[in-house]
């Protein structure tokens, strides 16, 4: 499990109303990934935020608050993947893809950069959307970027870039899905740049590990795509398109929506966007599989309310 109080404060989502006990500590030793014995209900810490933050770095800034998110077991349940995130000097987020044994051994950092959603393909390979090891990310992570003058210039530049990116749909900033080997010296290779040009929420088929189900974010028409993808043949099969809601959130409730959220999160997103996300109007498809792999199951709000849907894909695979 994760520290959802810390995740809510720093990640912008989680469980509201639970105070982060480590809100003054940039990398607490009593917060991290926990394991619970389902029989005895005993809870122990597998790895702390402090251990992860200190791993593989020569020095660590006390100005950056760190947190862990997006846990995922490999098929053999022998290793756990997760994302380590912290705020860079320019206000952006740095993400590290990490793995650790379920016994707490062999902590590894596989990739670092702008990294998003992922899943295990097999016991030793993870595919994740983003970019890793770029010069741009290395520059942004430099302490000099905390200089007020430089931060102001960067803020303006980022607004221009986001404006341009928002008007087009395609491969952004050298990002794509990356196949990452879970080893001490991870091999990383990009794939499917043209077939999957934007971020989504992939999940590998439980029985046929070459296949995954995935989605993407709304296009200019407000529609999300649901599709299957073969990771070996690099073959995409679209299943459907589902429209988002264009309603606006009740901004009179913004104090409720924003309560307990870190100021850096509030500075990185508009009030309207964050309120839309918190109001329940935002609904990613988040596709996943039924246990037998026959059904692709997803969330959607295209009929006006949040519902769970399923599609029989057994005749396709």
Listing of model-derived features with the role each one plays in the protein:
Residues 1-317:
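Sequence signature of WD/YWTD-type beta-propeller architectures
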């Amino acid at each position: 499990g994760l520290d959802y109080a810390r995740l809510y404060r720093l990640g912008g989502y989680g469980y509201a109303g639970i105070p982060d006990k480590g809100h003054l500590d940039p990398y607490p030793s009593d917060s991290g990934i926990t394991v619970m014995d389902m029989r005895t209900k005993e809870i122990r810490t597998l790895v702390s935020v402090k251990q992860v933050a200190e791993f593989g770095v020569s020095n660590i800034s006390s100005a950056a608050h760190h947190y862990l998110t997006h846990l995922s077991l490999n098929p053999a349940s022998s290793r756990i993947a997760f994302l380590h995130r912290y705020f860079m000097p320019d206000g952006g987020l740095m993400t590290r893809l990490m793995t650790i044994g379920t016994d707490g051994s062999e902590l590894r950092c596989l990739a670092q950069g702008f990294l998003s959603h992922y899943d295990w393909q097999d016991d030793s390979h993870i595919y994740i959307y983003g970019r890793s090891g770029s010069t741009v990310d290395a520059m942004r992570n430099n302490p000099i970027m905390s200089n007020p003058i430089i931060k102001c210039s960067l803020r303006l530049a980022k607004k221009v870039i986001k404006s341009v990116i928002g008007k087009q749909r395609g491969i952004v900033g050298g990002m794509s899905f990356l196949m990452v080997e879970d080893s001490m010296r991870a091999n990383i290779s990009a794939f499917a740049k043209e077939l999957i040009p934007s971020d989504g929420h992939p999940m590998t088929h439980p029985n046929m590990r070459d296949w995954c189900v995935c989605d993407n974010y709304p296009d200019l028409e407000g529609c999300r795509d649901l599709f299957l993808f073969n990771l070996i043949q690099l073959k995409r099969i679209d299943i459907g398109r589902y429209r988002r809601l264009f309603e606006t959130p009740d901004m009179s409730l913004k104090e409720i929506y924003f309560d307990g959220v870190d100021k850096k999160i509030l500075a990185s997103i508009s009030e309207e966007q964050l309120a839309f996300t918190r109001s329940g109007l935002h609904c990613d498809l988040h596709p996943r599989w039924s246990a037998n792999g026959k059904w692709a199951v997803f969330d959607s709000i295209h009929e006006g309310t949040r519902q769970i849907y399923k599609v029989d894909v057994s005749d396709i695979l």
